[in-house]
């Protein structure tokens, strides 16, 4: 998602984390991300040959008023429904929000930081893989939520390290 455009566009293929991951690995990567997507109530339909599900949601839930604990509870509910083995699931907590057009309060920033700890504990509880994108120096756009093009590249580079 490119927040610079009026209706929200997309960065070029060379700048999107999903496309960078596919290019660098040769893997078939299915991007199920949607602008504004919140944690679903039920597990997504996955292809039968899914090797790895990388799950990174929660920011929009926090923006819509969920507490970090409520968002983590929603994650637990959906992740518990998956028919994948624990080592086939990688939960990535989004980087913390920053002051910006979509982030009018310090409380949202604090909640996004608290959410990271909730997700870490959830991953341990479920025995699934975990990564904290807050540790990856991801640059965020003026809205305080979405990645810049450089942020996408940094995310992809760090994710590749986690997956190696």
Language-model-detected regions and their locations in the chain:
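A short helix->loop->beta-strand "cap" motif at the edges of active sites that frequently abuts
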Residues: 84-89, 128
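Short, solvent-exposed loop/turn segments at secondary-structure boundaries
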Residues: 5-10, 34, 65-69, 103-107, ...
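Charged helix-capping and loop-helix junction motifs
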Residues: 68-77, 108-116
């Amino acid at each position: 998602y490119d927040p610079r455009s009026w209706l929200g566009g997309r960065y070029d293929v060379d700048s999107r984390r999903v496309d960078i991951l596919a290019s660098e690995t040769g893997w078939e990567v299915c991007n199920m991300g949607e602008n504004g997507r919140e944690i679903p109530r039920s597990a997504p339909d996955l292809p039968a040959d899914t090797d790895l599900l990388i799950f990174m949601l929660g920011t929009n839930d926090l923006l819509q008023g969920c507490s970090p604990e409520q968002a983590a509870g929603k994650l637990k509910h959906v992740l518990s429904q998956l028919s994948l083995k624990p080592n086939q699931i990688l939960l990535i907590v989004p980087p913390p929000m920053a002051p910006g057009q979509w982030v009018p309060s310090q409380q949202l920033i604090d909640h996004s930081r608290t959410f990271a700890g909730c997700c870490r504990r959830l991953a341990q509880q479920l025995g699934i893989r975990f990564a904290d994108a807050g540790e990856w120096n991801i640059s965020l756009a003026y809205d305080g939520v979405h990645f810049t093009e450089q942020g996408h590249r940094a995310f992809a580079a760090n994710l590749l390290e986690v997956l190696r």
